[in-house]
């Protein structure tokens, strides 16, 4: 078994990538140009026409933000990292950086006949993101070597179950997108509840000597 490496640099790099991703999402919203001499009502109408862009912005920002929190939870469970975790984490970050593209598609085509394709691409990307998180979590928990002693098997299984539920729902959302695009977006948004629970869930640490349960400690608290 190779020596474990400290994860602080990887966490800092990951935080930066998440930050860049959410910044790129807002860049797709353009200030409307109405020309000189037009009254304020024209500008209001132009702003209201941007509602798909703002909707897509909120959806993607909240989703990426909650995923960043879950990423933080995962790494707080680890004593260190190895090459497998580094590669899996790189895949997660690559896919997170791609989120602005389907967000722009939804913003552009949500009210058009091409809405089904745009929403399907949006949901499909999150299938890949979810699958990458599963790979990262399995890489981190395999054999338990990289987990801190206080991380219980129950907590590991809970996170694993949540990830697979999320994957299944994203697959359903992608299929639904071809029939009811708006419903597909709602299904993706409903997953905020699942991911939010995962981000804030507390685990019960084990005593290495007697395996008795102690007080609840949130992994995001350190």
Which positions does each model-derived feature cover?
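Multi-pass alpha-helical transmembrane bundle typical of ion/small-solute transporters
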Residues: 1-222
